[in-house]
């Protein structure tokens, strides 16, 4: 397959746009990077890209959850369950005996983009509005949360 044909085979690519911002710089930067990783999914490097994506999702979820917990976000447990459900869906997809094909890569990209946009524009945006509307400035809270990995998602995929 030629490079031109390969590029035509990537119909479900969604670019980051400012409309996806939730108002928390660290989270917005992490979301932007997630879109970049999803966009990079292709058959030639799928295993490497999926590994990198999972590692980054572990870090992002951990950071986001730490912010929620530290700030006393009332919907923290609910949000945590959404992350766990996502992890289970990804585990099911990756646990399949099917090998990687162009169609399967497209299916994964479509699922990830749809989930990311839906999650960011509803649940993460709700958190962003809640946090930024609080009388206590959110900047110190965000700076206190060091990037880390762990939790349910890390255990599910054998990450440390």
What are these regions (language model features)?
Residues 2-160:
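Small-residue-biased structural context
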